[in-house]
Protein backbone atom coordinates (compact mmCIF):
# COMPACT_ATOMS: atom_id res chain seq x y z
CA UNK A 1 0.00 0.00 0.00
CA UNK A 2 2.85 2.39 0.82
CA UNK A 3 4.49 1.82 -2.53
CA UNK A 4 1.17 2.32 -4.25
CA UNK A 5 0.80 5.81 -2.66
CA UNK A 6 4.42 6.92 -2.76
CA UNK A 7 4.95 6.13 -6.45
CA UNK A 8 2.45 8.73 -7.78
CA UNK A 9 3.79 11.32 -5.33
CA UNK A 10 7.30 10.66 -6.60
CA UNK A 11 6.17 10.97 -10.23
CA UNK A 12 4.41 14.30 -9.53
CA UNK A 13 7.49 15.62 -7.72
CA UNK A 14 9.78 14.63 -10.61
CA UNK A 15 7.45 16.21 -13.18
CA UNK A 16 7.35 19.43 -11.17
CA UNK A 17 11.13 19.57 -10.92
CA UNK A 18 11.73 18.69 -14.58
CA UNK A 19 9.15 21.22 -15.78
CA UNK A 20 11.46 24.07 -14.85
CA UNK A 21 10.67 27.47 -13.46
CA UNK A 22 7.30 29.02 -14.17
CA UNK A 23 6.89 32.33 -15.99
CA UNK A 24 6.82 34.32 -12.76
CA UNK A 25 9.91 32.52 -11.48
CA UNK A 26 11.90 32.71 -14.69
CA UNK A 27 15.09 34.67 -14.89
CA UNK A 28 14.54 38.27 -15.98
CA UNK A 29 15.62 39.01 -19.49
CA UNK A 30 18.71 41.12 -20.05
CA UNK A 31 16.65 43.70 -21.94
CA UNK A 32 14.33 44.23 -18.97
CA UNK A 33 17.26 44.55 -16.58
CA UNK A 34 19.12 47.03 -18.75
CA UNK A 35 15.94 49.04 -19.29
CA UNK A 36 15.37 49.16 -15.55
CA UNK A 37 18.95 50.25 -14.95
CA UNK A 38 18.66 52.92 -17.64
CA UNK A 39 15.49 54.27 -16.03
CA UNK A 40 17.17 54.27 -12.61
CA UNK A 41 20.21 56.09 -14.01
CA UNK A 42 17.96 58.65 -15.73
CA UNK A 43 16.07 59.20 -12.47
CA UNK A 44 19.36 59.69 -10.62
CA UNK A 45 20.60 62.20 -13.18
CA UNK A 46 17.32 64.12 -13.08
CA UNK A 47 17.38 64.21 -9.30
CA UNK A 48 21.00 65.37 -9.31
CA UNK A 49 20.20 68.20 -11.72
CA UNK A 50 17.22 69.35 -9.67
CA UNK A 51 19.20 69.32 -6.41
CA UNK A 52 22.07 71.27 -7.99
CA UNK A 53 19.61 73.80 -9.40
CA UNK A 54 17.96 74.19 -5.99
CA UNK A 55 21.24 74.79 -4.17
CA UNK A 56 22.43 77.24 -6.83
CA UNK A 57 19.16 79.15 -6.53
CA UNK A 58 19.55 79.29 -2.73
CA UNK A 59 23.16 80.50 -3.04
CA UNK A 60 22.18 83.23 -5.48
CA UNK A 61 19.17 84.41 -3.51
CA UNK A 62 19.28 86.80 -0.58
CA UNK A 63 17.49 84.38 1.76
CA UNK A 64 20.67 83.34 3.65
CA UNK A 65 21.66 86.99 4.20
CA UNK A 66 18.15 87.95 5.35
CA UNK A 67 18.01 84.96 7.68
CA UNK A 68 21.42 85.77 9.15
CA UNK A 69 20.42 89.42 9.67
CA UNK A 70 17.12 88.40 11.29
CA UNK A 71 18.91 86.08 13.73
CA UNK A 72 21.49 88.77 14.54
CA UNK A 73 18.78 91.38 15.18
CA UNK A 74 16.75 88.98 17.31
CA UNK A 75 19.83 88.03 19.33
CA UNK A 76 20.65 91.71 19.90
CA UNK A 77 17.08 92.36 21.08
CA UNK A 78 17.27 89.45 23.52
CA UNK A 79 20.63 90.68 24.85
CA UNK A 80 19.23 94.20 25.33
CA UNK A 81 16.21 92.86 27.23
CA UNK A 82 18.45 90.79 29.46
CA UNK A 83 20.67 93.83 30.19
CA UNK A 84 17.66 95.99 31.07
CA UNK A 85 16.21 93.37 33.43
CA UNK A 86 19.53 92.68 35.15
Swiss-Prot record:
Keyword Secreted found: yes
UniProt-annotated location(s): Secreted
This protein's UniProt keywords: Lipid transport, Secreted, Signal, Transport, VLDL
A UniProt-annotated Pfam family: ApoC-I
This protein's GO CC annotations: high-density lipoprotein particle; very-low-density lipoprotein particle
Signal peptide segment: 1-26
One annotated GO biological process: lipid transport
MF-aspect GO terms: fatty acid binding; phospholipase inhibitor activity
Major subcellular location class: secreted
Job of this protein: Inhibitor of lipoprotein binding to the low density lipoprotein (LDL) receptor, LDL receptor-related protein, and very low density lipoprotein (VLDL) receptor. Associates with high density lipoproteins (HDL) and the triacylglycerol-rich lipoproteins in the plasma and makes up about 10% of the protein of the VLDL and 2% of that of HDL. Appears to interfere directly with fatty acid uptake and is also the major plasma inhibitor of cholesteryl ester transfer protein (CETP). Binds free fatty acids and reduces their intracellular esterification.
Note: Apolipoprotein C-I is present in acidic (APOC1A) and basic (APOC1B) forms in P.paniscus, P.abelii and P.troglodytes and perhaps also in baboons and macaques. The two genes for ApoC-I arose through a duplication process that occurred after the divergence of New World monkeys from the human lineage. In human, the acidic form has become a pseudogene sometime between the divergence of bonobos and chimpanzees from the human lineage and the appearance of the Denisovans. Pseudogenization resulted when the codon for the penultimate amino acid in the signal sequence was changed to a stop codon.
PANTHER family per record: APOLIPOPROTEIN C-I (PTHR16565:SF2)
Family of the protein in this entry: Belongs to the apolipoprotein C1 family.
Protein name: Apolipoprotein C-I
Organism: Plecturocebus moloch
Amino acid sequence: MRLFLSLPVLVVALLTILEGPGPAQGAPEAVDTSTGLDKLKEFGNTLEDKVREFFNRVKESDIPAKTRNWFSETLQKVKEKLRIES
